[in-house]
């Protein structure tokens, strides 16, 4: 009985220690609730805390793609050749192969619906020549729309040093997506 009790308390202590250490490293809750029609904010918490945006990054990837399409830099029917870099991205992905050719419209769908990292990288490389150049363009676009605390380092959102945004900045981007390029909703 004594041995069972000691085992129970040891297991409980280890679990509590593990959970508390995980909690110490958890990102803070951050949110902004805005009426996109008028910009009125109804809820805000840690709105300007810089956090990793994860797959929300793909909103900017698509925004820049739509911008490039509108500027006649590329078309929805342009064939994109998949690079070794894009094909090597970790999941979530659609398992694109190096050298494969696929229309931009299908890469956009894969990035938007499947959150495909390989598709997002291929989009960036097709538009700007490299992931690094595309990331710089994403950051410039963010600044131009008032996203002052956002820096992009890739097109897909996987964690990378310096790849950060805020809830407020993502709200700004979401609003721009809704109003600047509604013609691409049913792509």
Predicted regions and their residues:
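Bacterial N-terminal signal peptides that target proteins for export
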Residues: 1-12
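Bacterial N-terminal signal peptides
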Residues: 10-21
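Active-site-adjacent loops and short helices of periplasmic peptidoglycan-processing enzymes
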Residues: 22-168, 175-182
């Amino acid at each position: 009985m004594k041995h069972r009790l000691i085992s129970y308390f040891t297991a409980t202590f280890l679990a509590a220690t593990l959970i508390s250490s995980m909690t110490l490293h958890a990102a803070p809750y951050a949110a902004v609730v805005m009426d996109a029609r008028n910009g009125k904010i109804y809820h805000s918490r840690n709105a300007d805390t810089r956090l990793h945006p994860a797959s929300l990054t793909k909103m900017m990837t698509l925004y820049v793609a739509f911008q490039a399409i509108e500027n006649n830099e590329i078309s929805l029917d342009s064939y994109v050749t998949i690079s070794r870099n894009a094909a090597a991205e970790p999941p979530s992905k659609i398992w694109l192969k190096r050298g494969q050719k696929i229309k931009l419209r299908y890469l956009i769908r894969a990035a938007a619906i499947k959150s495909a990292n390989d598709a997002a990288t291929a989009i960036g490389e097709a538009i700007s020549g490299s992931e690094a150049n595309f990331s710089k363009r994403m950051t410039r676009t963010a600044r131009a729309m008032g996203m002052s605390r956002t820096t992009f380092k890739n097109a897909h959102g996987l964690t990378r040093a310096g790849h950060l945004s805020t809830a407020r900045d993502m709200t700004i981007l979401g609003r721009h997506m809704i109003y600047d390029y509604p013609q691409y909703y049913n792509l």
